[in-house]
Amino acid sequence: MISFNNVSKVYESGGQSVHAVEDVTLSVEKGEIFGIIGFSGAGKSTLLRLVNMLERPTAGTISIDDKDITSLSTKELRKLRQRIGMIFQSFNLFNSRTVFGNIAYPLKLAKVPKNEIKERVNELLKFVGLEDKANNYPEQLSGGQKQRVGIARALATSPDILICDEATSALDPETTTEILNLLKKVNREYNLTILLITHEMHVVKEICHRVAVMEKGKVIEEGKLFDVFTQPKTTTTQNFVRSVINDHLPESVLAKIQNGGQIYRLTFTGEETGQPVLSYIAKNYNVDVNVLYGNIIELQNVLFGNLLVELQGEQREIQKALQHLRLQVQLKEVEAHAS
């Protein structure tokens, strides 16, 4: 649905060229939630602004439904933007308008008849759970309620695409979960394509089908959520994943391990997570198993387990145990200082 083809955006600053986005090629499929994650300055926000042509690319093309939007006329561009809703970190509500008025605003701009505006706004108020807040002003709302208004306003013109710019960054953890659940509901019930940017990996984990990692204007890794989480290739991606799966061991534990024993990382997927593999090798081989770290998370309805274990015993027995483990799970030896 959305395609970036060798897209670059260059700014001139102090006589130097700054590559905010550099040679990005990405495809976002219709009906999916696609996340773009990166630290500040990675180029995420610039890439989003290129989708609705608030910024024009210096090079490359951007297509929506196989149509090159970089060549659209002003009139065609105005029509395109009606298909794209957007929500922001800072909500961007009109403080002088009620909740009803904020949601109705894009419909008035589109010259929708008053009776249809009322019907649509009431429908959206119910959808986002704010039926009793129609006459309230933004200052009377919590942060989560303000973002619900922002989502309703973004949906007002029945867009095909919803762009989310750090939509949960200003919210507490509980409210973040509520907003992410609402966005999943939007995606599910309206079959809306959602393109979001964030610097928080737990947001990606909770909501995205696929994800791209940006650094210094470039996409350095991209793929299905499960693949990126379970097999991160770059150091930056590995650091993001560790913000959700923190498997670094304390120095005091590492010091003891370095005096003996071997560390292995075991990863389980799907039904493997329920198998008693460690108890089996402890019973059937002369090996002591010390679990140093354990974690199980769910990624797009698939379980992923991650264990760090220390094996102690005679080398021959350890090798027998490892041979059995390799038949059951993914196994990798880990140096103590690199755990």
From Swiss-Prot:
PANTHER family: AMINO ACID IMPORT ATP-BINDING PROTEIN (PTHR43166), METHIONINE IMPORT ATP-BINDING PROTEIN METN (PTHR43166:SF30). Belongs to the ABC transporter superfamily. Methionine importer (TC 3.A.1.24) family. ATP binds at residues 38-45. It is found in: Cell membrane. The lineage of its organism: Bacteria, Bacillati, Bacillota, Bacilli, Bacillales. Residues 2-241 form the ABC transporter domain. InterPro entries: AAA+_ATPase, ABC_transporter-like_ATP-bd, ABC_transporter-like_CS, ACT-like_dom_sf, MetN_ABC, MetN_ABC_transporter-like, NIL_domain, P-loop_NTPase. Pfam families: ABC_tran, NIL. One of its GO terms (cellular component) is plasma membrane. Transmembrane segments: none annotated. The keyword Kinase does not apply. It catalyses: L-methionine(out) + ATP + H2O = L-methionine(in) + ADP + phosphate + H(+); D-methionine(out) + ATP + H2O = D-methionine(in) + ADP + phosphate + H(+). Its EC number is 7.4.2.11. This is Methionine import ATP-binding protein MetN 2. Its main location: membrane.
